[in-house]
Amino acid sequence: ISGVCKWAQNPDEVEFALSVLERLAKRYGNRKGLFGIQPLNEPITENMWETMDIQNRYAPADQEMAKGSAPITMKFLRQFYLDAYDRISAYMPKDKYVVIHDGFELMEWKDFMQEEKYSNVILDTHQYLMVAEARGCSQTIEGYLKYIREELEPQITEMEKYFPVICGEWCLFNSLACGCDTKGGQSVLNGVEG
């Protein structure tokens, strides 16, 4: 539901998600074609919540239901991943992976899941030029290349010391190609005219 972000605040819903992950691992964990399971896709943490101005970008359709909406904290996300790992790994051999999304906080995972027990964890990062723009990247070819070479590449290289890293999503959508400042990927669908 647009503008409603309260799942992590509801223990029953969190437990339901963990139970679904456990059932998926139990059912598919030994399948030859399975690479791994990712517990969450793009959990929105505090910095991204602020960068993307979520409550304005995705205005709540139901204001009452949206009351109390908030980003997922890193503390919650770390605990969720630990719990999910324990539930998933009980049904999967070590050659299957648990893939954790970085929550758009690529550099925040250096001290996490470094014990031998977690040798089959992969860190997934999703990179979008529109997010780089929202964080101040110059809207020029030179600006995009500088961002990739001087920020993104060194960060991924650094994090590869701690985890195998995959870039599970990458999008080149950008303001330069659109011919106008999209303010970090906004459009007429968000009420922003180009």
Locate predicted features.
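C-terminal/domain-terminus segments
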Residues: 176-194
